């Protein structure tokens, strides 16, 4: 859903196995820690002193962590549909073989990138079959035939003017959460009721844009693979291939402006995916902006703001007592030193300990309260992911008639895959400094960070802090810009204050009042308001010049 496992995993919470809670309180019994400590010593005695010290700190905090590393999930069961059931199959090898003559008279490939291993299968979804929306729809798979990876997508055309409206790629986070939960829980054309009926959403983001919902990385949602993807950079290659082949099949959409939006762990994904696209000079992807909602992008700057958000300094009453707040303060210096070590080396040997230690010491106190980490105003209901609607969505998407209508090939749909979550963490991906890619993107396009102000796990305080700390040529102007009221301007709620915004050049930060981790769920009118205005270019270097 949201990128929801974010919290789960985030919590330090490495799930030692499917039967365990994602977040576990630190074990205080020193005897329990003895065997893992010996294992660490035996296995990593060749590491330099700093890495060994980091792992010792982790084992002290989470004694059973070694058991979780050795867990290997089974591959998803699937039944591949014959080619005859698909309306179109786009062969990456054929696209890669196309050469054109440039303005300089030299021949070059029509589009860049290694595409020969990829195919795109496309199914025209009958709008009447599911009733999710009346607009034109396509679903299907991107196949990486070399690595046995199959990414599922679902495209909805704009309700307004699809021949001219922009195209948006939506990504949930986790890592390991399906973007179809974003579709049905947040910003898609319909939601799912308790009796598994579709309920029209007047605030869907396809009101004025065509939207692609992508289940990535593999083994998330309807996507599947015999292997796995466990870091953001590897996932970026797949997303570039999917977009390239999709726009090759549908050139009528390729000519439109294209934007990437997502939330939570998409704060990792989006800088990488956008940078991957821009790295190809010859491309058919007309990328114009990126939007990150309640994201995790710069942990070193964001982690110090967990304590203020949990302890009453983020605009809502405190969730934690004074002792818990003090424990977070006490643990912060060590946490930050470990994140700094990760930033310095970007190695799993330093980044994994930082993730485990900081998530348990800094996020753990909040999660052990039973409060919703995605909304400080509510308790957690419906299991680890805290939203009962997720169960309804999973039941709906597991229906045979739904799977058939979409061409889904897996035996079951799950909203979030905790194995993926764990794999990303143990590759060190969690704490890596993906914010370092953002300055290069700001130089090329508008960048928006928006944050619902009731979220704990990727809270607005931390997102505002890293936005203001980011070093790039326009840093001083952005840091000095004032937060101004954000109001509705073009409907019956005209004049209603929905948040605050600060912007300078191509960089914008928004605080959305009353929104949790998933702003479109909690504040649908506000989310469509800022989205429509963003797509029109209201906050950009061009509009402010």
Curated annotation (Swiss-Prot):
The gene is CPYA. Residues 1-17 form the signal peptide. The lineage of its organism: Eukaryota, Fungi, Dikarya, Ascomycota, Pezizomycotina. Its main location: other. InterPro entries: AB_hydrolase_fold, Peptidase_S10, Ser_caboxypep_ser_AS. Its EC number is 3.4.16.5. It is an enzyme of class 3 (hydrolase). Belongs to the peptidase S10 family. This is Carboxypeptidase Y homolog A. GO terms for molecular function: serine-type carboxypeptidase activity. Vacuolar carboxypeptidase involved in degradation of small peptides. Digests preferentially peptides containing an aliphatic or hydrophobic residue in P1' position, as well as methionine, leucine or phenylalanine in P1 position of ester substrate. GO terms for biological process: proteolysis. It comes from the Eukaryota.
């Amino acid at each position: 859903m949201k990128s929801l496992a974010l919290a789960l995993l985030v919590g330090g919470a490495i799930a030692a196995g499917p039967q365990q809670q994602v977040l576990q309180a630190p074990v205080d019994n020193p005897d329990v820690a003895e065997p893992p400590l010996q294992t660490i010593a035996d296995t990593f005695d060749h590491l330099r002193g700093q890495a060994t010290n980091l792992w010792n700190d982790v084992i002290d905090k989470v004694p059973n962590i070694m058991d979780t590393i050795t867990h290997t999930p089974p591959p998803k069961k699937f039944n591949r549909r014959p080619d005859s059931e698909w309306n179109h199959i786009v062969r990456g090898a054929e696209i890669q073989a196309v050469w054109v003559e440039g303005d300089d008279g030299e021949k070059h490939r029509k589009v860049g990138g290694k595409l020969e291993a990829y195919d795109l299968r496309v199914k025209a979804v009958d709008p009447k079959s599911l009733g999710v929306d009346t607009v034109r729809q396509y679903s299907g798979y991107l196949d990486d035939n070399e690595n046995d990876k199959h990414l599922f997508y679902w495209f909805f055309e704009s309700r307004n003017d699809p021949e001219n409206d922009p195209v948006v790629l939506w990504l949930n986070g986790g890592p390991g959460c399906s973007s179809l939960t974003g579709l049905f829980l947040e910003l898609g054309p319909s939601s799912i009721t308790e009796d598994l009926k579709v309920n029209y959403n007047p605030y869907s983001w396809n009101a004025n844009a065509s939207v692609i919902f992508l289940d990535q990385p593999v083994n998330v949602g309807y996507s599947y693979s015999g292997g796995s993807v466990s870091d953001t950079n590897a996932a970026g290659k797949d997303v570039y291939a999917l977009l390239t082949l999709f726009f090759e099949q549908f050139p009528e959409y390729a000519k439109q402006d294209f934007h990437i939006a997502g939330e939570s762990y998409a704060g990792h994904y989006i800088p990488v995916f956008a940078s991957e696209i821009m790295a190809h000079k010859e491309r058919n992807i007309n990328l114009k902006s990126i939007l990150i909602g309640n994201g995790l992008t710069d942990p070193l700057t964001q982690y110090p703001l967990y304590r203020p958000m949990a302890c009453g300094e983020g605009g809502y009453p405190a969730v934690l007592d004074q002792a818990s707040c003090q424990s977070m303060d006490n643990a912060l210096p060590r946490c930050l030193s470990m994140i700094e070590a990760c930033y310095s080396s970007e190695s799993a040997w330093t980044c994994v300990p930082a993730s485990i230690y900081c998530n348990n010491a800094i996020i753990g106190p909040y999660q052990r309260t039973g409060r919703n980490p995605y909304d400080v105003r509510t308790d957690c209901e419906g299991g680890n992911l805290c939203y009962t609607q997720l169960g309804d969505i999973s039941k709906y998407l597991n229906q045979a008639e739904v799977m058939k209508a979409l061409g889904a090939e897996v035996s079951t749909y799950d909203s979030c895959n905790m194995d993926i979550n764990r794999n990303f963490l143990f590759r060190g991906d969690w704490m890596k400094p993906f914010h370092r890619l953002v300055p290069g993107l700001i130089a090329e396009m508008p960048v928006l960070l928006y944050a619902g102000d009731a979220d704990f796990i990727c809270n607005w305080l931390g997102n505002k802090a890293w936005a203001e700390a980011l070093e790039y040529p326009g840093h001083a102007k952005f840091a000095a810009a004032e937060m101004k009221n954000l109001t509705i301007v073009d409907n019956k709620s005209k004049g209603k204050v929905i948040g605050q915004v600060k912007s300078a050049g191509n960089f914008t930060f928004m605080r959305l009042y009353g929104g949790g981790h998933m702003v479109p769920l909690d504040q649908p009118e506000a989310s469509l308001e800022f989205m429509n205005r963003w797509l029109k270019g209201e906050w950009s270097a061009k509009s402010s010049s």
